[in-house]
């Protein structure tokens, strides 16, 4: 049996702003409109489908982790730094401005415009030394 992740819905105050934030930061194709969503397509066909949430509704921050190459990490982290985006080496945000080196890779956490915890990492946790 072959099971693959296809899509998830990501709550946002401004779906276009949040989707474009990610595509610009990750150098992905521009988001596309599909029904009420702004769709960010990732490799292997998976997508993040951004949906607007009313101001009166709470957005519960979620965590989204993206496995990237070393070169992609350098490019994305360069944009994070150039934009002055707050970032951390850990999910608890206790190591601001730092990168983690877990399992022989690199990882960093930052927030998107809707407040979701985004993470880029070069090696899956538990995969190395």
Where are the predicted features?
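Conserved beta-strand and immediately adjacent loop positions that scaffold enzyme active sites
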Residues: 7, 37, 107
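Amphipathic alpha-helical segments
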Residues: 14-29
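Residue-level "edge-of-site" marker
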Residues: 35-36, 93, 128
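Conserved short beta-strand elements that form part of the metal-binding/catalytic scaffold
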Residues: 28-62, 66-70, 103, 111, ...
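Structured loop/turn residues at beta-strand edges in well-structured enzyme cores
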Residues: 1-3, 59, 113
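N-terminal beta-strand motif that seeds the catalytic metal site of vicinal oxygen chelate
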Residues: 1-16, 63-64, 68, 123-129
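Vicinal oxygen chelate
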Residues: 16, 65-113, 117, 125
């Amino acid at each position: 049996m072959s099971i693959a992740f296809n899509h998830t819905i990501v709550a946002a105050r401004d779906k276009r702003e949040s989707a474009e934030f990610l595509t610009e930061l990750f150098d992905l194709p521009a988001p596309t409109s599909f029904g009420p969503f702004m769709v960010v397509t990732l490799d292997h066909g998976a997508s993040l489908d951004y949906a607007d949430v009313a101001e009166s509704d709470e957005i519960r921050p979620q965590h989204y982790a993206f496995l990237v190459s070393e070169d992609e990490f350098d490019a994305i982290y360069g944009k994070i730094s150039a934009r002055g985006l707050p970032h951390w080496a850990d999910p608890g945000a206790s190591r601001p401005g730092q990168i983690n080196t877990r399992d022989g890779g690199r990882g960093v956490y930052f927030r998107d415009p809707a407040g979701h915890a985004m993470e880029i990492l070069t090696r899956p946790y538990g995969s190395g030394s």
